[in-house]
Amino acid sequence: MSTSLVSRLTRHARLSARAVNHHEGQTPPFLIVFINSICNLTCEHCFYWRNLNQRDDLTYDEFKRLSLELGQIEILNLSGGEPFIRPEFAEICQLFTENNGVKQIYVPTNGYFTDRTEKQLRGVLQSKTLQRFVCEISLDGMPAYHNRFRGNPKSFEKAMETVDMLARLQKEDPRLRIHSNTVAMSENMDEIWELTEYLHDHCPAIEHHNLAIIRGDRKNASLQGPALDRYKKLYEHVAEVWKDREEGRFGSVVEPMLQWAKVKTIETGTQYVPCKAGILSGVVYANGDVSMCETHPPLGNLRRKSFFEIWDSPEAKALRQQIKQKQCFCTNEVFLWPSITFQPVQLTKALVNAKLLQIQASGT
């Protein structure tokens, strides 16, 4: 048995044990950090729109204090705002790689600021311990639709320029991976069908196209989620288009399980997979608010209390019980992924059902 396989199995066993219960003083191994609130676009599906472009973002020193308080973090998901607008982006990443042992960083971006993004990434990739940095380019459809939806006539063109830059940078450092992310809504099903083919054919460095289902308090309240039958067919199309690049990709085994879980969650209107938000994952917003997930309100603020004063508070314990009792549900991949992967029963269930769906799809 190879050393890398033993390491992965050991990690999986450790995190599966962690998923059972929260103990005081335990750092969530999967942390979502809104690195800023500043954004240059006006996306209609944004769930964070009420909090954008504020003047109370955490300072570098406040991020440093947070990092020094926290323990080991497996994966850091940085969000915003547009994350690469943050001047100290690379320095903040460095805090978490050095102080918290972060090995993987995922960042969604609108791709508008090519030069800034390259500068920040070159800084981040100076880390000798970082194993993977995934840059996720957000695209809503083909150019005309995407530009109109995001309120900027050059947003698609700028994103493609950033993809080209990332492809060049990846040749220098293969730890950099390039994904695209699209929010599925009732109105952009045809757009995504065409977009996924376009990205596969024109962007050979992109290894994965992810579909997320619209959620939360979107800016345009009229936007609705897709009909599930259409969404299932769209996902089958995306999977077929990208199957040549999914083979061997880190995370490719989990992808069909995520899609299965999202559909079952919507179909049943319940927390179909027992959620481990507040145990395996947590959220820190740009203003210092701390929450267990993006569905529930914040539990406290880092400018008034330390992270663990908030994370281990009576209010936090009560919310963990609510989540455990399945009083909420969502289709957020960032929380579904660890909830599936590090619960053996759920992992087996998702693996079997996702495989059955793949067999059914291949037979139609």
Give residue ranges: language-model regions.
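Short, intrinsically disordered, charge-biased short linear motifs at domain edges
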Residues: E24-F34, M257-K264, W311-Q321
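Flexible mid-to-C-terminal extensions adjoining Fe-S/redox cofactors in radical SAM and related proteins
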Residues: Q26, T270, D289-T364
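The −1 position to Zn-ligating cysteines in a subset of zinc-ribbon hairpins
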Residues: I38, T42, Q271-P274, N287, ...
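Conserved alpha-helical substructure of the radical SAM core
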Residues: S2-R132, Q343, T364
